[in-house]
Amino acid sequence: MMRPNRSFLGSTPRNISRHFPSLSTISRRQFTDAASHSSNKIQVYTSTSRDPFLNLSVEHHLLQKTPPESTVLFLYTNDPCIVFGRNQNPWMEVNLRRLAQFRNDPASVGWTGGPVQLVRRRSGGGAVFHDEGNVNFSVICPPAVFDRNKHAEMVARALSSLGRPNTRVNERHDIVIDIPDDPIGTYKISGSAYKLTRLRSLHHGTCLLRSPNLTNISGMLRSPAEPYIKTRGVDSVRSPVRNVGIENAAFEAAVVEQFASMYGNFDVREVISDKVLETDSISKGYEELQSRDWIYGQTPKFTFSTFPYEEDPRERPQLDFDTKLRFEARHGVVDKFTAEGPSSPASEDGLSALTSSSIYNVSSWGAQLSQAGMADGVAAKVGPWMDNILGVDFTKPQQ
């Protein structure tokens, strides 16, 4: 989501027609028993955790363990993070250098939101930013009744009930808000992603409510490496975005209300916490999502080139060095690396030593290129540029 604008603020109705009692947090055992019990056809869960890796692991557990004929609603809010699609390229989709600045020197860029985590989800779709001003919703149901608009429209109705009548689902299955007399007119407030298995289907999305970081979203989701990368992965579709100006709790209650209107009484309505991490399947999923092999190593094949070539004839930005660089990578590992220039900066045999290097484990491209035989003066120019473009300060292993 890109190109943020000012928030749309307004009064929020305080009362919702159906009253749901206050809920206490259930234990790990209670959660796993309730989720998997065959009699629990309609289930609703809200997470108190802000850990994106945990919440996505809970979501995956619900997808795998809930009864095949059940319908499940899961609501959660994450700490600041960028969540990108199963088949996306983080070097293409994310300004990794900016994330390094947020983590290592936030004052230099005026950032006060804490570290922004990078998360690869298990479903498809594009890259999105989450923070405390977003609520995420997931609906899991039988594939036979899956519809890309059905539950997006449920969320749009919830927003309408809270005084946002100009919300609707567009042709891309996104939830948008129309603002009369605004020069842009229509803003995206919610994007969705999907995962279908033989027995279950998942539709999940996020809704921009009161994000304090709206003006930073564009800078995080626009990679400086984009002009140089051609990928087989999925590209994000950028849209103007804005807040809708609703409190998280009111939004959650309204979505639960609409879910109840669609499916009737709940068999389960519970709150979960970090305790569910003690569940074996959730713990294993949590470890996988946090692993560098998952975040970076699942990247589809791509080519990085500083110059146009037959398969990617785009013009490149002007550089302050004349060396032509190109490498191919599979699963984040260099498959072939070439460097050409007037000074013959490195031999083919030397550059072949870069093959099998994991891009995300490189701490200094200058050092790598020097070791491969590139002249020190050339490597001193090319290396820092590559470090910057590829976000080495963020991707390299932390000490």
Residues of each region from the PLM?
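N-terminal lobe of the biotin/lipoate ligase/transferase fold
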Residues: 2-149, 377-385, 392-399
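Long, positively charged amphipathic alpha-helical accessory segments at protein N-termini or as interdomain linkers
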Residues: 61, 153-167, 185-307, 340-399
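Short, glycine-/Ser/Thr-/acidic-enriched flexible segments
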Residues: 80, 89-90, 214, 334, ...
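Short loop segments at secondary-structure junctions
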Residues: 87-88, 141-144, 180-182, 211-214
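FAD-binding core of FAD-dependent oxidoreductases
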Residues: 121-136, 172-180, 188, 193-202, ...
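Contiguous, small/hydrophobic- and glycine-enriched helical/loop subdomains that border
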Residues: 132-179
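Detector for conserved single-position "signature" residues within domains
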Residues: 310, 315
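Catalytic-core signal marking the mid-to-C-terminal active-site face
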Residues: 319-349
